[in-house]
């Protein structure tokens, strides 16, 4: 989307992006610092939120774990017009994120205008980093990095705006080792990572309804980094060789696309239904051009096999033992999928290794890494 379109169709680029050039500093308020007390307080600045958003779910889950570990969190929305007041926002969180954000002592506010001193202030998206850069009413600044956000845009202004935030001098808390290494090596940031897990009360093996060959594809045509077109071309090649195969699409409504093979269009789907779909499939395709998503572990825990691309962005967690890895080429994806469908014994080994990996993960253990990084940084 162009900057002009982003600017509400008015071409008012300067006004729309005024927060990028705003260099007014928010100073330390000593009286607020002295009144906080001994318990460590964290300010989290988050972008606008919609029901079930994956990135926000990970943030809220981390906040809940940290709250139980003794770090008190306040959540502040940056540039949101969705809510009428703080209570409206809190009711929204309770309705849509109660499983992830399950500590009632966590505070939530609709605007950074009310933000007061905290020991640490944490940016959670590139837009929020611009506010945190000028917020000096804090002792330490962190950046909760879940993906390489410049990659969300064509090379241009917004790519640059996003990339520049990695040079603001914050300490990075990254989702996985690929981002940790990238923040350290490419931008000189001090960084620590946390790993992934999944909700095993939802994502678990289920008995299949039949033995029909079936594939799942995570379909997000509105999200370019999920490479929908690449996946669709690959599935069409598979269909030519396996005309009886069935495909399940989940993630977005694909009814407006010409799809010549038999398929089921789940559209946007609740986690329970997604887990059931995984369990019905031999192989689940997840295109991941930037950072790995949580979905591979969810697929594995559901008793299916994940297929995704080679690359450091994925292989910090996945490997050839637990995953079908392919080159980002329709022909190679087709060949790999057909090969493992033709060799069910080898597919079963990957399924077993994937389940073992999924069962070895734990969200609390990963949150402990975040806790230790924050506490050690504050005491340094």
Per-range role (PLM):
Residues 58, 77, 182-189, 193-264, ...:
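Conserved catalytic-core segment of nucleotide-activated headgroup transferases in glycan assembly
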Residues 21-31, 150-156, 192-212:
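Acidic anion/phosphate-binding donor-loop and adjacent secondary structure
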Residues 279-291, 304:
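Acidic donor-binding loop of glycosyltransferase active sites
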Residues 298, 310-325:
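Short acidic/histidine- and often glycine-rich active-site loop of Leloir-type glycosyltransferases
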Residues 342-376:
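A charged, aromatic-enriched C-terminal amphipathic alpha-helix characteristic of glycosyltransferases
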Residues 108-117, 155-172:
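Membrane-proximal helix-turn-helix segments that form the acceptor-binding/catalytic region
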Residues 320-331, 339-344:
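Conserved acidic donor-binding segment of nucleotide-sugar-dependent glycosyltransferases
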Residues 305-309:
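Short hydrophobic beta-strand element within catalytic cores of glycosyltransferases
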């Amino acid at each position: 989307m162009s900057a002009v379109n982003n600017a509400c169709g008015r071409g008012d680029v300067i006004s729309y992006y005024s927060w990028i050039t705003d260099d007014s500093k928010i100073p330390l308020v000593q009286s607020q610092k002295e009144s906080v007390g001994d318990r460590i307080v964290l300010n989290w600045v988050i972008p606008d939120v919609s029901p079930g958003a994956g990135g926000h779910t990970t943030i809220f889950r981390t906040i809940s774990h940290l709250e139980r570990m003794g770090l008190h969190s306040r959540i502040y929305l940056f540039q949101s017009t969705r809510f009428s007041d703080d209570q409206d926002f809190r009711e929204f969180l309770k309705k849509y994120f109660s499983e992830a954000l399950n500590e009632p002592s966590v505070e939530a506010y609709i605007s950074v205008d009310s933000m007061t001193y905290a020991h640490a202030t944490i940016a959670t998206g590139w837009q929020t980093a611009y506010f945190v850069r000028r917020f000096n009413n804090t002792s330490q600044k962190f950046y909760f990095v879940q993906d390489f956000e410049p990659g969300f845009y064509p090379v241009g202004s917004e790519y640059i705006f996003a990339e520049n935030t990695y040079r603001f001098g914050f300490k990075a808390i990254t989702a996985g080792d690929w981002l940790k290494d990238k923040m350290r090596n490419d931008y000189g940031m001090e960084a620590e990572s946390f790993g992934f897990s999944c909700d095993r009360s939802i994502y678990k093996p289920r008995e299949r309804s039949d033995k029909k060959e079936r594939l799942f594809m995570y379909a997000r045509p509105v999200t370019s980094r999920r490479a929908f077109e690449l996946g669709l071309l690959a599935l069409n090649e598979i269909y030519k060789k396996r005309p009886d195969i069935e495909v399940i699409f989940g993630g977005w409504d694909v009814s407006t696309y010409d799809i010549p093979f038999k398929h089921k269009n789940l559209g946007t789907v609740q986690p329970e239904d997604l887990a059931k779909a995984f369990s019905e499939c031999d192989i689940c395709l997840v295109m991941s051009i930037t950072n790995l998503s949580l979905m591979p572990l969810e697929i594995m825990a559901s008793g299916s096999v994940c297929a995704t691309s080679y690359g450091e962005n994925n292989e910090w967690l996945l490997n050839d033992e637990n995953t079908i890895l392919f080159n980002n080429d329709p022909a190679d994806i087709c060949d790999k999928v057909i090969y493992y469908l033709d060799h069910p014994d080898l597919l079963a080994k990957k399924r077993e290794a994937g389940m073992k990996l999924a069962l070895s993960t734990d969200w609390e253990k990963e949150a402990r890494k975040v806790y230790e990084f924050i506490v050690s940084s504050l005491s340094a």
